[in-house]
């Protein structure tokens, strides 16, 4: 890229301390390699190994930190304080997007469809949860991504083990009504929705979990997604409203379901999605003509807004 010098010195933020560190290292290395191939002066920067105050030596930052510390507004706040432009969503939108309950509350308040849920505490009567949500349910840590700590619960006697698994990752746990149907993901670039992708994990996988996302090679990705043109546009419009409602910006991803009656349900938002070989944003942008290198440069272009 002939004018790559306009970016100056770029820190590719990767790794970190969250449960998603390994994925972030893979994503970050892929982004770093793409930027270097594009002529950008980019360097890896792992906040686990270096003080974030060293970021003053860079002109801008490409955030590829997944999970806590990188996707929850913390590193965004540091970069704001240091007056360093960065990719993706700002402090508030990142903090909201990392909190599944806050996200749902905002969507509900915006009259957007999201699956019913209950916050689980030690005092929660699990029978009342089953009465309200039915079975199966999915148990989730509220502040983790990449499906870390999630479990599908089909029998009441399995509740306790699923909650114990989730609490290993987060003090706050939620139960969400299980939506039977087709799973879709909608990626965003420059704040606009990309072609919808249908996710079809193999039959032995209960849902699109961590292993399916990053380790298995038998997940099917449907592009085109199998929806009619009208339905796809409806889902894209719904997800754009949801993306904007939580304050997400630039690039990201929203996961959704279509139930057996044809209704769409929003699951969650990802403000720093994966950028590995298995990842969904690169698959969506490839469908509209972007190479991976072009995608990375396009995301970085966002940091020039108002500074060029």
From Swiss-Prot:
**Catalytic activity, per the record?**
2 D-alanine + ATP = D-alanyl-D-alanine + ADP + phosphate + H(+)
User: What residue ranges carry the coiled-coil annotation?
Assistant: none
Q: Which GO terms describe its molecular function?
A: ATP binding; D-alanine-D-alanine ligase activity; metal ion binding
- Which sites bind Mg(2+) 2? 268, 270
Q: InterPro entries, alphabetically? A: ATP-grasp, D-Ala_lig_Van_CS, D_ala_D_ala, Dala_Dala_lig_C, Dala_Dala_lig_N, PreATP-grasp_dom_sf
Report whether Manganese shows up as a keyword of the record: yes
For this protein, the record's Pfam families field holds: Dala_Dala_lig_C (PF07478), Dala_Dala_lig_N (PF01820)
Q: Which UniProt keywords apply?
A: ATP-binding, Cell shape, Cell wall biogenesis/degradation, Cytoplasm, Ligase, Magnesium, Manganese, Metal-binding, Nucleotide-binding, Peptidoglycan synthesis
Tree of life domain: Bacteria
User: PANTHER family under this entry?
Assistant: D-ALANINE--D-ALANINE LIGASE, D-ALANINE--D-ALANINE LIGASE B
* This protein's name: D-alanine--D-alanine ligase
Which organism does this record belong to? Acinetobacter baumannii (strain SDF)
């Amino acid at each position: 890229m002939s004018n790559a010098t306009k970016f100056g010195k770029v820190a590719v933020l990767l790794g970190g301390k969250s449960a998603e560190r390994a994925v972030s290292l893979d994503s970050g290395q892929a982004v770093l390699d793409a930027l270097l191939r594009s002529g950008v002066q980019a360097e890896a920067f792992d906040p686990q190994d270096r003080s974030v105050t060293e970021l003053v030596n860079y002109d801008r930052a490409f955030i590829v930190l997944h999970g806590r510390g990188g996707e929850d507004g913390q590193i965004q706040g540091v970069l704001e304080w240091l007056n360093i432009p960065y990719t993706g969503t700002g402090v508030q939108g990142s903090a909201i997007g990392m909190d599944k309950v806050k996200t749902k509350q905002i969507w509900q308040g915006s009259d957007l469809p999201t699956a019913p849920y209950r916050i689980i505490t030690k005092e929660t009567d699990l029978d009342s949860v089953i009465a309200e949500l039915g079975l199966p349910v999915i148990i989730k840590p509220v502040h983790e991504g990449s499906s870390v700590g999630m479990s599908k619960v089909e029998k009441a006697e399995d509740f306790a083990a699923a909650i114990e698994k989730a609490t290993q990752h987060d003090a706050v746990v939620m139960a969400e009504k299980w939506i039977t149907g087709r799973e879709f993901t909608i990626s965003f670039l420059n704040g606009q929705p990309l072609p919808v992708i249908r996710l079809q994990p193999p039959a032995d996988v209960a849902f699109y979990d961590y292993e399916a996302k990053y380790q298995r090679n038998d997940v099917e990705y449907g592009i085109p997604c199998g929806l009619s043109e009208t339905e796809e546009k409806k889902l894209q419009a719904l997800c754009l409203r949801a993306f904007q409602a939580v304050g997400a910006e630039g690039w990201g991803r929203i996961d959704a379901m279509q139930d057996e009656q044809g209704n769409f349900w929003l699951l969650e938002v990802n403000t720093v999605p994966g950028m590995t070989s298995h990842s969904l944003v690169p698959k969506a942008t490839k469908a509209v003509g972007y190479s991976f290198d072009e995608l990375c440069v396009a995301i970085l272009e966002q940091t020039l807004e108002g500074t060029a």
